Amino acid sequence: MASTLFRNIQTHPLLLYPTSFFRRKSSVFYCTVNSTSPTATQEKQQCPRIKVSPQTQSKSLDKLTKDYETIIGIETHVQLSTLTKAFCSCPYNYGAQPNSTICPVCMGLPGALPVLNSKVIEFAVKLGLALNCKLSLNSKFDRKQYFYPDLPKGYQISQFDIPIATSGYVDLDLPVEFGGGHRRFGITRVHMEEDAGKLLHSGGGISGAIVDLNRAGVPLLEIVSEPDMRNGIEAAEYAAELQRVVRYLGVSNGNMQEGSLRCDVNVSIRPIGQSEFGTKVEIKNLNSFSSINRAIDFEISRQVLLHSQGQSDSIVQETRLWEEGAQKTVTMRKKEGLSDYRYFPEPDLPEVVLTEEYVDSIQSSLPELPETKRRRYENMGLSMQDVLFLANDTSVAEFFDATIAQGAQVKLAANWIMGDIAAYMKNEKVSINEIKLTPKELAELIASIKGGIISGKIGKEILFELIAKGGTVKGLIKEKDLVQIVDPAEIEKMVDKVLSENPKQLEQYRAGKTKLQGFFAGQVMKASKGKANPGLLNKILQEKLNAKS
């Protein structure tokens, strides 16, 4: 009965404030008086602005950065694609009306107890195994305490000292345009936690600012990397590989624009040869892989300039925001320490206990992962450029695998998918799952061209019709009478006719203007409606053109 009453109660604006407002007075004072956010005046006093002309910066920066080593680590939050939230039965739909999918548990109301979604455990184990981590068979949840309007309970359910997975790594291949090569980056830990709500500001029908708790309680996996990256390109490629992994596993859609994959980057620099780490700065608001790269490059430049001007003390442990429009980072707040969060075990949830049998069952269900797929494609003889393109998207990789399973030659299948099919998808803004062409028909098309049944030109025309409308290769060839002409006598008649109709061009060719061979070939192809076998046509044409008159 109590549950029914809770689910049907009308939401009151006051209930959207953090429950810490209703706690004891001392607790409120702790959260408000001891604020770590500096005022604008304090920030100006602590971090004097450096004025460097663009000309001076561009000339000296490359030289200066060579004297420093950059240390980069990334904390990645992956929003899980579960049907319901982590600790209640509410669904989560991106873009839903504010506060339309909430309940007493999401809102942190007194007496509302969390119940763990088993899918969160399953997805955490999957990701831990995929990232080559050591799993904790016994782990627990903890309360991470901090004050913010979008955190209704006044704490976040997370994992502190015993995360579900530790000590892993991820392998990736850098694109050729970035120097290529294989990289391995360490994974410190993977832990489960719940998401917070979101502050919505003026715009889109909203006046002022409101707290939207739809996202509160949505399950997350936080992946903490080792500080193994040394530049923006490596960091961006690491994040892209994590996106590929979670999409291959099906644990998340990994869409950065929806907040399903959020990366917080920690950057510090130190003089070459120094073993002690420099002061790290956290960067947030990174909504794309390119913004990760650019934000890191800017932050490296900023810190190097401060060091070079004797103002390294101005580099403080803080959180900075990446401003896409201004292409720079700006101070958001001073960084909290672990002690500020006052972690302690979550009393309302039991320990998470995994059995070896459970882990083994998940291990056996894992799909082929991006790294394994890249090595398999490489062993097929494909170039690294081809490998990276095909393995980047799980749907494209599945389409390619299905095509070669139908007997298509590996390189030809890759060329068609990476060329005309990819161009069509880009122009029409569709995925490979949305086109009408099937792997079976692509394999049939490749075989028809290779077997001389149709020409490559006709093949392209058929391809675009198959992509847009579907159908079969054999059906279209028969319907449109597209079978290639391979009878030498028939092609010879067409060549003779074209030469007799163009005596002036024939005379010019025999006078030394040999580029006109292409003109004659084009005329014959036009007469045959593109059906003349190109190899046979060129052979007969050359014999006729070079024959003595």
From Swiss-Prot:
The cysteines covalently paired via disulfide bonds are none
Per UniProt, subcellular location reads as:
Mitochondrion; Plastid, Chloroplast
**Class of this enzyme:** ligase
KW ATP-binding (keyword) present = yes
PROSITE patterns per record: GATB (PS01234)
Which keywords accompany this UniProt record? Answer: ATP-binding, Chloroplast, Ligase, Mitochondrion, Nucleotide-binding, Plastid, Protein biosynthesis
Q: Which reaction does it catalyse?
A: L-glutamyl-tRNA(Gln) + L-glutamine + ATP + H2O = L-glutaminyl-tRNA(Gln) + L-glutamate + ADP + phosphate + H(+)
Could you tell me the EC number(s) of this protein?
6.3.5.-
Q: What does this protein do?
A: Allows the formation of correctly charged Gln-tRNA(Gln) through the transamidation of misacylated Glu-tRNA(Gln) in chloroplasts and mitochondria. The reaction takes place in the presence of glutamine and ATP through an activated gamma-phospho-Glu-tRNA(Gln).
**Family per UniProt?**
Belongs to the GatB/GatE family. GatB subfamily.
Give the protein name, as stated in the record. Glutamyl-tRNA(Gln) amidotransferase subunit B, chloroplastic/mitochondrial
